[in-house]
Swiss-Prot record:
Provenance organism: Shewanella amazonensis (strain ATCC BAA-1098 / SB2B)
GO MF: 2 iron, 2 sulfur cluster binding; hydroxylamine reductase activity; metal ion binding; peroxidase activity
This protein's name: Hydroxylamine reductase
Location of Cysteine persulfide modifications: 408
Co-factor note (free text): Binds 1 [2Fe-2S] cluster. Binds 1 hybrid [4Fe-2O-2S] cluster.
Name of the coding gene: hcp
Amino acid sequence: MFCIQCEQTIRTPAGNGCSYAQGMCGKLAATSDLQDLLIYMLKGVSAWAVKARELGLPPTEADTFVPKAFFATLTNVNFDDERIIEYARKAESLRNVLKTQCTEAAQKAGIRLESLPDSASVLLGTSKPELLEQAKAALPNLGKDDIHEDVMALRLLCLYGLKGAAAYMEHARVLEQQSADIAAEFHRIMAFLGTDSVDADALFTVAMDIGQLNFKVMAMLDEGETAAFGHPEPTQVNTKPVKGKAILVSGHDMKDLELILKQTQGKGINVYTHGEMLPALAYPEFKQYPHLVGNYGSAWQNQQKEFANFPGAVVMTSNCIIDPNVGQYADRIFTRSIVGWPGVVHLEGDDFSAVIEKALSLEGFLYDEISHQITIGFARNALMAAAPAVVENVKNGSIRHFFLVGGCDGDKAERSYFTDFAKATPNDSLILTLGCGKYKFNKLEFGDINGIPRLLDIGQCNDAYSAIQLAIALSEVFECDINELPLSLVLSWFEQKAIVILLTLLSLGVKNIRTGPTPPAFLTPNLLKVLEDKFGLKNTTTVEADLNAILNVA
């Protein structure tokens, strides 16, 4: 086992990364190794998908399967060995079909196919022990003693960044948003990673390509969500329980939430969002369901306590899942799509009757708690509608600075930095937030500036697209570069979606971003220095020091 993809990975003087019997996330060594083997096989699929396009063959299932299966290897998504093996075998099958099609097409055209990496032809073993033995050749740090540490760091940066983009591609696909051009670029990069390049410059260029790719993916996902559910609008949301039977929907999948709401109509069940599903309550389409009563709980890392206390059924539509046996609720949590946990019921298709039956069999909430309202829904359209008022308040001096404070949440005590930072921002500034990092401060009162709320909840982590669009609009109004705006980005990271959003911002030329609470363990000091020199990327220090530096206070 070697895994170094998330913020909570082991860090020691002897080296970084989880490389023992179990990772910090609870992932067993065998599961980690099987995920590495799956990624290896997916690189082989992409290698042939690239060849197929070069030969003029039509797109295949690989365009959707590879990103989806890649998503399954994201932090806190799938811990089920059998499901991972199933994905790997399907990858082998798809690859073999593509290989045959390409070979036949090349023969007809009189073209000689160049050799491809081993992942394009290796045959999987028939047993789990054989697969685990094969996985030794798929470790992400394979050959680390023979190549420069910066090259290894760049490989991992690209791998984890592309993994984040794959997750957003799958979210978009669920909403019937796909692009042949995006799929082609994804396969190109995936196939390139399969060559194990030692060219640092080429790897750095590909990292920026991944950022550019993800910007297009986020735009596609934004289109999918708004086409299906309307544009989010400022909305008051209750964060306290309501009396009655209950279902909790966590993850990111709005389509699953819609299906659950339709199937629970008239059944006396209240539905709650959790974690990154909170923004759903701001979409017009969901407001037709009175039994969508609010948001329960907070960010992913608190689920073992929150789910244990939730007296109903829970559905995990995507990341993040952690061991449900700790809180003894494994018998009433259900997984969907790419999510998996051994022994937990996995739902295929669109029938949620098992969830409904479980919810009806449970006690539910016995009484209403006193309502506590928070405001959400300041996504792209709402921000653009508010832009004239924002511009006027900037011009008259009422608004002097913008802060984007958000990203991933996590366990570490150091993450209290983001709570303290938000609380310390001056009263003449606006705070934009997104992702589950918002839970560090989204129930606090920040007041308003001439009717404009100081705290503007943009939405899910992928709604960084909305923040980018606002920054572009403001830069056009003020006729300046984005980096000349009074805008500072302070981002918390945990996993691979955050990595690709960072790459997206860097690829767009956004500079002077602060990230925390710690730098990615897979990045070397030298590479961090390159990112600082080229983009002004900095790690968070203390709230006082960072705010003083941002606001040029001596």
